[in-house]
UniProtKB/Swiss-Prot annotation:
Gene3D superfamilies: 3.30.160.20, 3.30.230.10. With S4 and S12 plays an important role in translational accuracy. Located at the back of the 30S subunit body where it stabilizes the conformation of the head with respect to the body. PROSITE patterns: RIBOSOMAL_S5 (PS00585), S5_DSRBD (PS50881). One of its GO terms (molecular function) is rRNA binding. The lineage of its organism: Bacteria, Bacillati, Mycoplasmatota, Mycoplasmoidales, Mycoplasmoidaceae. Part of the 30S ribosomal subunit. Contacts proteins S4 and S8. Residues 58-121 form the S5 DRBM domain. One of its GO terms (biological process) is translation. GO terms for cellular component: cytosolic small ribosomal subunit. Keywords: Ribonucleoprotein, Ribosomal protein, RNA-binding, rRNA-binding. PANTHER family: MITOCHONDRIAL RIBOSOMAL PROTEIN S5. InterPro entries: Ribosomal_Su5_D2-typ_SF (IPR020568), Ribosomal_uS5 (IPR000851), Ribosomal_uS5_bac-type (IPR005712), Ribosomal_uS5_C (IPR005324), Ribosomal_uS5_N (IPR013810), Ribosomal_uS5_N_CS (IPR018192), Ribsml_uS5_D2-typ_fold_subgr (IPR014721). This is Small ribosomal subunit protein uS5. Belongs to the universal ribosomal protein uS5 family.
Amino acid sequence: MNDQKTTNTGLLTSTLKTKPKHNLKPSSEAIKKAVSKKEGHYKNKRFQKHNFNNKSEFEERIVKLKRISKTTKGGRNMRFSVLVVVGNKKGKVGYGIAKALEVPLAIKKAIKKAHNSIHTVEIHKGSIYHEVIGRKGASKVLLKPAPLGTGIIAGGAIRAIVELAGFSDIYTKNLGRNTPINMIHATMDGILKQLSPKKVALLRNKPISDL
């Protein structure tokens, strides 16, 4: 009996000795390769998602933040509405409005919409080429070129647009309703309606020297 137990113990010991050992802990090189591969994947994913512009160069400004409510059978549903303007002060500007239950989420959504609606505007010596009136609904905004050193003569929502677009000398005046979103629409309408000498030459089918 004792001899049989000794034999079984010997077989078990030999089996354990001959069983291959599996190294469950990965090496440091394998860990580094996996981490670098994962980081590269996320970097490429972010680049593909946001390759329309470089957000780091854009400045963001909140023009209007207000609380809104909707009355239903269950009571009032409170939310926040945010109007944001973004621009790089080099001829690119956009704006967005969004609503959410919390202020940070509303701001984030508005900024995303603003970045998705970027417009490229023409700037002539820090101002615009000629006098123009932009319209949106009952809002009208007058834009006039100003000499060097005048500065930005504007306020509120109009100032946010012209400043972040990159204008340094310009006269503006609100001629209608002062609803922030409509004023921004009207200002953008006026800025985009201006005609440079090159555009006028193309419309008239003449060289710039003949204008």
